[in-house]
Amino acid sequence: MTNKDESVKKNTESTVEETNVKQNIDDSVEQAEESKGHLQDEAIEETSDENVIEEIDPKDQKINELQQLADENEEKYLRLYAEFENYKRRIQKENEINKTYQAQRVLTDILPAIDNIERALQIEGDDETFKSLQKGVQMVHESLINALKDNGLEVIKTEGEAFDPNIHQAVVQDDNPDFESGEITQELQKGYKLKDRVLRPSMVKVNQ
């Protein structure tokens, strides 16, 4: 082979090699571009996912805030409801006490009038006019006592009962063999209660 042919061969090989290198470079560039494109697509997808998350998070936060507010309002409502129920019970109890005290004052003022009526009924007389008048007074007395009993008035039991300093007032001591020691032998003045309240203790004679 001549020097010329050898030179041509080398040039040809160099050209082929350059072409291959260029092709490899082009392929690498293309692959790099494709990889870059994939990375950009993935970045876009990740960005989209982040946007979705960013869009969801505020909603969840708002829901949590509303739930917390609802819980707080429910707690306030239950507390206010309990306070209102306690207030109603307290007012009802105060009204009942006030009614009792009002009735107590009225009945206490009436008791002397009842005593006078009962003393008048103890007077004896043979005159028909007197008897008729006494019968009318007795009917008034019974009606008054029944009306007062319907409103809680109660006569305190005395004779034969054991002396109770909470409802009885001992004014005289007695020595009666027909009664046990500490028993009431005689009632000197009637005592009255209004439900569980003593309006006036009974004045009694107590056996020794």
From Swiss-Prot:
- Family, per the entry? Belongs to the GrpE family.
GO BP: any one term: protein folding
- InterPro entries named in the record: GrpE (IPR000740), GrpE_coiled_coil (IPR013805), GrpE_head (IPR009012)
Annotated region described as Disordered, given as residue ranges: 1-51
Localized where? Cytoplasm
What is this protein for, i.e. what is its function? Participates actively in the response to hyperosmotic and heat shock by preventing the aggregation of stress-denatured proteins, in association with DnaK and GrpE. It is the nucleotide exchange factor for DnaK and may function as a thermosensor. Unfolded proteins bind initially to DnaJ; upon interaction with the DnaJ-bound protein, DnaK hydrolyzes its bound ATP, resulting in the formation of a stable complex. GrpE releases ADP from DnaK; ATP binding to DnaK triggers the release of the substrate protein, thus completing the reaction cycle.
GO CC field: cytoplasm
Q: Name one GO molecular function term.
A: adenyl-nucleotide exchange factor activity
NCBIfam families the UniProt entry points to: PRK14140.1
Regions of biased composition (Polar residues) lie at 13-23
Q: Where is the composition biased (Basic and acidic residues)?
A: 1-12
Enumerate the HAMAP family for this protein: GrpE
- Per its UniProt record, what Gene3D superfamilies does this chain match? 3.90.20.20, Head domain of nucleotide exchange factor GrpE (2.30.22.10)
**Source organism superkingdom:** Bacteria
**PROSITE patterns noted in UniProt:** GRPE
Q: Where is the composition biased (Acidic residues)?
A: 42-51
- Recorded protein name is Protein GrpE
What is its quaternary makeup?
Homodimer.
